[in-house]
């Protein structure tokens, strides 16, 4: 009996340590209303992005009658929906990518070191929690935070690392990167 209680306490401690490695950002909070027989019942909806700043990121949505409870639900949802994104040199994207969700479209471009995060609102929160330090991003169409976050995740999902491209083509990564560097020189010579 005492051993079970001890083990449960240790599990909780490990879980708290694991949770502390994540950085969370509140992207949007919104007051919502449910129409009931007696009138309107007001609550809150929260959109949270969470990440470990090392390539794992997730987003979650939560609704509750009180703001802190909505944020907690959104954070729990984000922890359940974590995805891994391959980063180049641990600081930027491997290539330029495009993502869309609904009317929201985003363009993400890899950037040289020292550029910083050039992105607006919800996209900036995703990049900061993901650990990207250099990126240029542009959103076109819907400015709805939910659509922008989902479009950003859609774009990140379509990114390929050189290792995955090389595996798909059955070639070595060094060959692929030599073509990438040498390809520009060959085009200039022609």
Curated annotation (Swiss-Prot):
Keywords of this entry: Ribonucleoprotein, Ribosomal protein, RNA-binding, rRNA-binding
InterPro entries per record: Ribosomal_Su5_D2-typ_SF (IPR020568), Ribosomal_uS5 (IPR000851), Ribosomal_uS5_bac-type (IPR005712), Ribosomal_uS5_C (IPR005324), Ribosomal_uS5_N (IPR013810), Ribosomal_uS5_N_CS (IPR018192), Ribsml_uS5_D2-typ_fold_subgr (IPR014721)
Domain of life per record: Bacteria
Record domain S5 DRBM: where: 22-85
PROSITE patterns: RIBOSOMAL_S5 (PS00585), S5_DSRBD (PS50881)
Any one Gene Ontology cellular component term annotated for this protein: small ribosomal subunit
Protein family (similarity comment): Belongs to the universal ribosomal protein uS5 family.
NCBIfam families reported for this sequence: rpsE_bact
Oligomeric and partner information: Part of the 30S ribosomal subunit. Contacts proteins S4 and S8.
Domain notes: The N-terminal domain interacts with the head of the 30S subunit; the C-terminal domain interacts with the body and contacts protein S4. The interaction surface between S4 and S5 is involved in control of translational fidelity.
Full protein name: Small ribosomal subunit protein uS5
Gene that this polypeptide is encoded by: rpsE
């Amino acid at each position: 009996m005492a051993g079970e209680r001890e083990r449960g306490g240790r599990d909780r401690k490990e879980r708290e340590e694991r949770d502390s490695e994540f950085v969370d950002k509140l992207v949007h909070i919104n007051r919502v209303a449910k129409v009931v027989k007696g009138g309107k019942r007001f609550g809150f909806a929260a959109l949270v992005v969470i990440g470990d700043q090392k390539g794992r990121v997730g987003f979650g949505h939560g609704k509750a009658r009180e703001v802190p409870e909505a944020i907690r639900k959104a954070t729990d949802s984000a922890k359940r929906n974590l995805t891994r994104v391959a980063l180049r040199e641990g600081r930027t994207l491997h290539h330029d990518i495009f993502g869309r969700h609904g009317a929201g479209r985003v363009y993400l471009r890899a950037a040289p070191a020292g550029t910083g995060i050039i992105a607006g609102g919800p996209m900036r929160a995703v990049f900061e929690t993901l650990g990207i330090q250099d990126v240029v991003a542009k959103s076109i169409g819907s400015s709805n935070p939910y659509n922008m976050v989902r479009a950003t995740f859609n774009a990140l999902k379509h990114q390929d690392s050189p290792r995955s491209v090389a595996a798909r083509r059955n070639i070595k990564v060094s060959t692929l990167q030599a073509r990438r560097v040498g390809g520009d020189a060959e085009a200039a010579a022609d």
